[in-house]
Regions:
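Hydrophobic faces of well-ordered beta-strands that scaffold small-molecule active sites
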Residues: 6-10, 47-49, 77-81, 100-102, ...
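Conserved, mostly hydrophobic/aromatic
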Residues: 11, 39, 47, 79, ...
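Glycine-rich, proline-tolerant flexible connector loops at the mouths of alpha/beta enzymes
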Residues: 46-65, 104, 169-180
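Short, acidic/polar
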Residues: 28-40, 84-90, 149-159, 207-210
Length: 251
């Protein structure tokens, strides 16, 4: 049986860790290298470094931060935000990233994702679904949730799987930063519609939220931020609680 992964997500604007709610109202809360080092030392399984505004302003400023982070952090690191071409992927991997997450550019040109998988392998490419609920369905958003894509989020997840990505990170815009629980219905719909690993993101407020979501959705990992950034709990406490609830967790 595979072991469930706890992933620390660090959203970055320029050289600062930022966090808001529903991917809006971002405010500076710290230094990304310090956050990454602290989470690594505390036992996080993986990290995601996400440029919060890169796709809006046609830039990719994570490389310097990634290089500094990799000097002291020795777990898998994914970077995302502003990945537009194969050169961006190559630069990220050369700088120390293990994987890249792609959303906006993939929705604009699915052949980019296919080319990325063909060149670097599915294990290096994470498909990203950023979804907002509208009545009885979810729509995929681009540019850090600023613009609607017109594509159904579940369909987007299926397209990503067909394109060959190794796993999919599903972010609920409605739950992001609120720490009131995941959109389990969204995550469950994605897990039931695909056969590759799914990372749930958006809404973790407690170990109970994570345990409930695992039981309801059968996802493979969670990416968490606010609950750690604001020190509502620790990685050690989360892992201990999940283990006591029968979750096969990495120690």
């Amino acid at each position: 049986m595979h072991k469930f992964r706890l992933i620390g997500r660090i959203d970055i604007n320029n050289e600062n860790v930022v966090k808001g709610k529903c991917l809006e109202g971002l405010r500076k809360i710290g230094n990304p290298e310090e956050f990454a080092s602290r989470y690594y030392k505390s036992g996080i399984d993986e990290l995601v470094l996400m440029d919060a505004v890169a796709s809006l302003y046609d830039r990719n400023s994570l490389i310097k931060i990634l290089k500094e982070t990799c000097k002291n952090v020795f777990i898998p690191i994914t970077i995302g935000g502003g990945i537009r071409n194969l050169e961006d992927i190559q630069e990220a991997l050369n700088a120390g990233a293990d994987k890249v997450a792609i959303n906006s550019q993939g929705l604009r040109d699915i052949n980019f994702i296919k080319d990325a998988v063909r060149n670097y392998g599915s294990q290096a490419i994470i498909g990203s679904v950023v979804a907002r609920e509208f009545r009885y369905s979810w729509e995929a958003f681009i540019d850090n949730a600023k613009h609607r894509s017109g594509v159904d989020a579940i369909d987007w997840a299926k397209i990503l799987e067909d394109a060959g990505v190794g796993e999919i990170m599903v972010t609920s815009i409605d739950r992001d930063g609120r720490m009131k629980g995941f959109d389990s219905k969204l995550i469950k719909t994605v897990t039931e519609s695909t056969k590759i690993p799914i990372i749930a993101c958006g809404g973790a407020g407690s170990a109970s939220d994570i345990s409930s979501m695992i039981n309801e959705t059968n996802c493979d990992a969670v990416a968490i931020s606010s609950i750690l950034h604001y020190e509502h709990t620790s990685i050690e406490k989360l892992k201990d609680s999940l283990s006591k609830n029968g979750v096969q967790i990495r120690k």
